[in-house]
From Swiss-Prot:
The lineage of its organism: Bacteria, Pseudomonadati, Pseudomonadota, Gammaproteobacteria, Vibrionales. InterPro entries: PsdUridine_synth_cat_dom_sf (IPR020103), PsdUridine_synth_TruD (IPR001656), PsdUridine_synth_TruD_CS (IPR020119), PsdUridine_synth_TruD_insert (IPR011760), TruD_catalytic (IPR042214), TruD_insert_sf (IPR043165), TruD_pseudoU_synthase (IPR050170). Responsible for synthesis of pseudouridine from uracil-13 in transfer RNAs. This is tRNA pseudouridine synthase D. The gene is truD. Belongs to the pseudouridine synthase TruD family. Its EC number is 5.4.99.27. The keyword tRNA processing applies. Residues 158-304 form the TRUD domain. It comes from the Bacteria. It comes from Aliivibrio salmonicida (strain LFI1238). It catalyses: uridine(13) in tRNA = pseudouridine(13) in tRNA.
């Protein structure tokens, strides 16, 4: 388990079990779920790939070279992990492709398979991703009984909707750099770095808000001044501590939200504000970066409920299957089940 995540509270207490995740790429399978169908015609070639041990940007750049286009002419709905087997779509602005033999691309890149091709009238964008389905295999698991007991709780209550360790970079470097940028008022034209550091800053503060609620025993219990979200992420103006709202939260019809910090005033009041404002105040450098880039405040649910969650056990091996909506992290589910033993990897 990444040390950076040990900063945040566990909903069910720190796990006693240990295990290995991603011992092989085949132990972490991700399949992308888009929110719409392609038209079958248009200037954009849509390519469904299965990649093993490769990251999305590398494959996209290699595919752009093969097609004879610039990197900016290729796009995707979501970035996928390198240490996994992942299926996803790429789009290439390529009005004509009859001259290309795509088998040659697969031969040159044995870690990539082309599964399907079609066409569409516009390119893929990050907001196009509806979610992902996962199959995760944890190996060398100890204390399997405790893991299974936790899984039963997860199925009912869910897990904290934390941003995962990958959001914060290797050893939390994105947060460290975000603080430096805020402190030194760094200005740059590198939009990629700016995006990484802003995301890390807001995610770090958000995670701390959830962690504080767990510590004080208010993870799934609304308090005065809370902002609730419906199933379409729209804010709900009701008496949030009423029995009706509490029952809707238990049924998953409403969810408690926490702040993705911005340069405008927090909308929470009373006790809910006391969970949020101190976390913003504790990170003046991160807030300087957020305000300096005129980020607007947003809300995000504090609960994550994996859909279609089921599992199987074979000896000391646990197989998990579930689906998540876009923007959620599979690793925060595993985090509530076991302490991850780091797997040594070699890099080409």
């Amino acid at each position: 388990m990444s040390d950076i995540m040990s900063t945040f509270s566990w909903l069910y207490g720190k796990p006693v079990a240990t295990g290995k995740l991603k011992q092989l790429p085949e132990h972490f399978i991700v399949k992308e779920v888009l929110g719409y169908e392609f038209t079958g015609k248009g200037e954009h070639l849509m390519v469904k790939i299965r990649k093993t041990g490769e990251n999305t940007k590398y494959v996209a750049n290699e595919f752009a070279k093969f097609c004879g286009v610039k990197s900016k002419d290729i796009s995707w709905a979501g970035l996928k992990d390198r240490h996994a087997v992942t299926e996803q779509w790429l789009s290439v602005h390529l009005p004509k492709s009859d001259h290309l033999n795509f088998v040659l691309f697969e031969v040159a890149h044995p870690g990539v398979e082309i599964l399907e091709m079609t066409r569409h009238h516009k390119k893929l964008r990050p907001g196009d991703l509806l979610g992902n389905s996962f199959q995760l295999i944890a190996t060398e698991v100890t204390d399997m009984d405790d893991v299974l007991a936790r899984l039963e709780k997860v199925k009912v209550t869910g897990v904290p909707n934390y941003f995962g360790a990958q959001r914060f970079g290797h050893e939390g470097n994105n947060v460290t750099e975000a603080r430096r940028w805020g402190r030194e008022n760094v200005r740059t034209r590198d939009n990629t770095k700016r995006s990484f550091y802003l995301s890390a800053a807001r995610s770090w503060i958000f995670n701390h808000i959830i962690s504080q609620r767990i510590t004080e025993g208010y993870f799934s219990l609304p308090v005065d001044g809370d902002i609730l979200l419906d199933q379409n992420d729209r804010t709900v103006n009701e008496n949030v501590t009423s029995e009706d709202c509490i029952q809707k939260i238990k049924k998953g019809e409403l969810s408690i939200s926490a702040a993705l910090a911005g340069d405008n005033q927090l909308p929470t009041t009373e006790k809910a504000l006391m969970f949020e404002q101190p976390q913003l105040d504790a990170e003046p450098d991160l807030m300087a970066l957020i305000r300096g880039n005129r980020m607007r405040h947003e809300r995000r649910s504090i609960e994550l409920h994996p859909e279609n969650l089921h599992w199987s056990v074979e000896g000391d091996q646990l197989t998990l299957n579930f689906s998540l909506t876009s923007g959620s992290f599979a690793t925060v589910i595993v985090r509530e089940l076991l302490q991850e033993i780091e797997v040594e990897r070699t890099y080409d």
